[in-house]
Amino acid sequence: MTNGTPGVPGGEPPHPSAEMLASATKGFDYLFANDIVGSREHFNSKDDPFHLMGAGVIAFLEAALGMETNQVTEASRCLALSETGTRKQMKAPKAKTHSRFPAGLEWDIINADAVVLLGLTHALSETYMGYLQCMYSLNNAHSKFTKLYKTVFPAGIDAEEKPPAPAEVAPSSSSTLQVPNGLQHKSSFSSLSSVSSTGSNATLPPAPPSPTQPAVTKSFFSRWLGSSAAAAASEPTLPLHHHQHHHIPDGPVEELIVSGTAFGYGLFNLVFSLLPKKVQSLVGFLGFQHDRKLALKALALSASKKDVHGVFAGLVLMTYHGVVLLLSGWQADEARIINQYKGIIDNVEERYPEGALWILNRAKILRMSCDAEGAIRVLQNGLKPERPHSFAQADMMLLFELAWTLLGQRRYQESADSFMKITELNTWSHATYYFLSAGCHFALGNLEKTQELLDAIPGLIHNKKVGGKDLPTEVFIKKKLAFYKEKQKRRCGDEAKFAEAIRINPAEELGIFWNTHARVSKEICKSHVADVLHLTPALTITSPTITALSSNSNSNPTLPTPASATAAMSSLSLSSKSSTASKTSPPSLSKSKSPLDLDTPDELAVRSLLLGICHRTLEEFDAARKFLLDAHGYQGQVKVNTWVGGVAMFELAVLELKEVEFLEKGGGKVDWMKAMKVADERLDVALSLSPNSVDLSSRLDSRISMLRDEMGIKREMLGGKA
């Protein structure tokens, strides 16, 4: 859906769908500028499939971003009407058009969009029937986008000639959105996944001309139902349409067709490629294939267009780059990712400077570039009450990012307030936000508030389940609360005040899953080390940072007391033994009759894991390796924190790569292939330690997949075998 007049450049009569498309585009302009009220009013003013789709998108975003169940019904209603309307248009007689594409192809695009969103809306119901309907819809849409891809890009995406820009639309100034060269389309969708995800150029021949539609890979549903899908079976077959030497400049409808096809096809490939391996095996059985490199090319092509699909493609790419930068742990070419990320944002933000989603991603770039304070300023400005328009669900995402960034900066009071404010904006897992806020108050030494928040959590945990299971973070939280209570009981304390038994900040512990400690300053990392340095039993691993912190503590007894020591409520002495302690044995606490702070393997494992991550950020790699190996060493002894072993091995894999990168920057001789071999072995162990029974195992599974992809890119850069 493209900005501009509906007519076709060059004096040709307007496309039959151009007027509806131009009007619907205006509604999306309101949405992207945060004016959700104006957008809804505009879409509700007409009942054609384009406008019904727009109304459905608004309701879907409200339902998905805010987990607002009352919007699910409205989204389903609008999207179902749009799907029905486009299906009628697909079967209706087609007027003659001056276009390089078959007449009416735009309706196939909108129909496929409606089917995808309708399927995802079914999934929001969190019922077994909803999930079944979702899989059915996705299978249907998968077939549709496969056919569209073959029609719109018969020789592959790279063979798509960049058409002359319509007179009313200026070409994109972002060079980062140009589609790379080198990939040729193969003759079937199933073969696309065999294109090397690491090779820079494929030499496969283009698909030969054919008067009929090539066979689509049979899926589980097609075998089960006897056709690819009931709805798809009633569609007219899309012919292969060769248009390699078109001379008619593209108008808005042509941009919709190109951008929409590339977006839908790329989105499917990318989403399936990011699923945990265990889930990929299931969707592979269902017939879904994926090729991440092709997905990114398709999305980049879509994002380079001015059509509405291009904006959504840009948003998908921003989200992908943000996730890789945050969770993969290491990137083969971080500067390239950040530059591409910036280019996409610049392209969209120029058109919609007030849009919350672009503000969010601008802040993420700053955070990933280690400018957390800059990110905080951007987010706070984006949340100012004097803004002309606001989109509550998008604001929630800004607030979520702000809360995590403040937590990473140890601005605990502001972070606690932000997490609690999120509970006013959406209904998703208030227990998680209370737990994080409680951790912030623990860090501030406010045990009374910590206890108050933790006491409220059992009443907040939803009975509603996802896929028949509790929310992963809530499973984690329930285990932690039981652990704290058991520890307090074991120590003969008042069980109603179990917060007294906490020694390691709950928010920082949960933050390990969000990789909070990887992109913070060295000073902040030193503060994290100081928080757990004096906990008993004494550390048996030392480092330059530990030695320096211990020495400072001895020479300056007026230093602030760590929150963990405040929580101890005991007569522990924070003064260390003589500063002449051995380099291989860090200074320890004075002997005391008080119970140990950390009296279980679970706590000792988490302390070592946190120290390992922080020392890696401090570039003290030897100590980091020792701490991470120590954390993994408790694997057979932990009872609650069974996730630590797998995460520790993942962090060790990241360490192997970061250490070589650090040495290379310093001019040292390095062996990347050896380092990646060791990292691969670490990841194998990590994967073996994260079965479904382990907390947040799917998150670790996805992180492992992303890191391996980055290693594949590095091998390509080195000219080695993937």
From Swiss-Prot:
Q: Name one Pfam family in it.
A: Iml2-TPR_39
UniProt KW keywords:
Cytoplasm, Nucleus, Phosphoprotein
The annotated subunit structure for this chain is: Interacts with lipid droplet proteins.
Q: Which residues, by range, are in coiled-coil regions?
A: none
Q: Which domain of life is it from?
A: Eukaryota
- Organism the protein comes from: Coprinopsis cinerea (strain Okayama-7 / 130 / ATCC MYA-4618 / FGSC 9003) (Inky cap fungus)
What name has this protein been given in UniProt? Inclusion body clearance protein IML2
- Protein's job: Inclusion body (IB) resident protein that interacts strongly with lipid droplet (LD) proteins. Involved in LD-mediated IB clearing after protein folding stress, probably by enabling access to the IBs of an LD-stored soluble sterol derivative that acts as a chaperone in inclusion clearing.
GO cellular component term of the entry, any:
nucleus
Q: Does the keyword Protease apply?
A: no
Provide ranges: composition bias, Low complexity: 187-204, 576-595
Entries under InterPro entries matching the protein? Iml2/TPR_39, TPR-like_helical_dom_sf
Q: Where in the cell is it found?
A: Cytoplasm; Nucleus
* Recorded family membership: Belongs to the IML2 family.
- Predominant place of localization: cytoplasm
Region called Disordered, residue ranges: 186-215, 576-597
